């Protein structure tokens, strides 16, 4: 895992087309902005896991299946 330190307003690049910018920090929360091509899916981890479990037919925690 690559660990980086960024300040508000600073950006990191993932490949040539994806940027992640730190928009703000408030307490233990960090607001980030992700700029990626339309064909690149960007999800929060818990949403991604739900999508994957729905694809495989495995109920997710708290799901109503």
Swiss-Prot record:
One of its GO terms (molecular function) is mRNA 5'-UTR binding. The keyword Cytoplasm applies. Pfam families: CsrA (PF02599). GO terms for biological process: mRNA catabolic process; negative regulation of translational initiation; positive regulation of translational initiation; regulation of carbohydrate metabolic process. InterPro entries: CsrA (IPR003751), CsrA_sf (IPR036107). Keywords: Activator, Cytoplasm, Repressor, RNA-binding, Translation regulation. GO terms for cellular component: cytosol. It is found in: Cytoplasm. It comes from the Bacteria. The keyword Cytoplasm applies. Homodimer; the beta-strands of each monomer intercalate to form a hydrophobic core, while the alpha-helices form wings that extend away from the core. Belongs to the CsrA/RsmA family. A key translational regulator that binds mRNA to regulate translation initiation and/or mRNA stability. Mediates global changes in gene expression, shifting from rapid growth to stress survival by linking envelope stress, the stringent response and the catabolite repression systems. Usually binds in the 5'-UTR; binding at or near the Shine-Dalgarno sequence prevents ribosome-binding, repressing translation, binding elsewhere in the 5'-UTR can activate translation and/or stabilize the mRNA. Its function is antagonized by small RNA(s). HAMAP family: CsrA. PANTHER family: CARBON STORAGE REGULATOR (PTHR34984:SF1). This is Translational regulator CsrA. It comes from Shewanella baltica (strain OS155 / ATCC BAA-1091). The gene is csrA.
């Amino acid at each position: 895992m690559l660990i980086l330190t960024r300040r508000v307003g600073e950006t990191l690049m993932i490949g040539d087309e994806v940027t992640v910018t730190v928009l703000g920090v408030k307490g233990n929360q960090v607001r980030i902005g992700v700029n990626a091509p339309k064909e690149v899916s960007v999800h929060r981890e818990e949403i991604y896991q739900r999508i994957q479990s729905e694809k495989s037919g495995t109920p997710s925690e708290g799901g109503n299946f």
